[in-house]
């Protein structure tokens, strides 16, 4: 619930700013003429719904999450973490591919794309590097570093913070996995509501 609640708030905010570059395929509608204009769904990246919506938005249209639509998504019964890592892999592929199109984006869309690109490609590594530096400093006697690490660990009881940290871990793992497998196709998972 924590991730999905956060996800929905961000997608709606991006939609109000201009367009959202991230979709979950359980409920997405595309105008056929626009699908044809962008060449349909890409087969080279896993987040085909998100990438197609972004390519449409780059042509001056909008890709939005609707605040009054209701959709129930089934989640995997087993392999939930693998599912989250795969989804993270696909979004990393999407934003890495979208980087070269940033100059074509309108200012509203460019802002959204820059923030999401930073959050998916760079932010997880900033956290990993900062944590590594703090660990080193704490081991070598820095009371400030130790205090920050204890504070960060204690904050894990706060659900939004825990959700953010977990998401950063999925993104780091996904980036590493993308080095040897892009996992464009995968087996169907049994899902529960």
List each model region and its residues.
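N-terminal membrane-anchoring/stem segments of glycan-assembly enzymes
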Residues: 15, 153-155, 170, 174
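Transmembrane alpha-helical segments that form the membrane-embedded catalytic/substrate-channel core
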Residues: 91, 125, 151-163
